[in-house]
Amino acid sequence: MNIISNILIGLIKFYKMVISPYLTPSCRYLPTCSEYTIECLRTYGLVKAISKSTKRIFSCHPIKILGGGEGFDPVNKEFKAKK
């Protein structure tokens, strides 16, 4: 994992500990979008993680016809990034 991925993971953890407790819980997925992003960074690396996480975050809304989703959606670990 590169330094940029580690910085992003640190920022996400900061968000979860400092900012998120003051917001209404709104993630429709399990694991949450922030947990999913951290796992993608650890599994796939920076570029693919950003792509997968962005898609996931944009689908985290209730309107199915516009691509909204919910439920259990873990990171697919079958295709790991080459190291």
From Swiss-Prot:
A Pfam family hit: YidD
Keyword Lipid metabolism belongs to the record: no
Entry keyword set: Cell inner membrane, Cell membrane, Membrane
Example of a GO cellular component annotation carried by this entry: plasma membrane
Protein localization: Cell inner membrane
Stated role: Could be involved in insertion of integral membrane proteins into the membrane.
HAMAP family, A to Z: UPF0161_YidD
InterPro entries: Membr_insert_effic_factor_YidD
Protein name listed in UniProt: Putative membrane protein insertion efficiency factor
Family named by the database record: Belongs to the UPF0161 family.
Keyword Nucleotide-binding: no
Membrane topology: Peripheral membrane protein
Family annotation (NCBIfam families): membrane protein insertion efficiency factor YidD
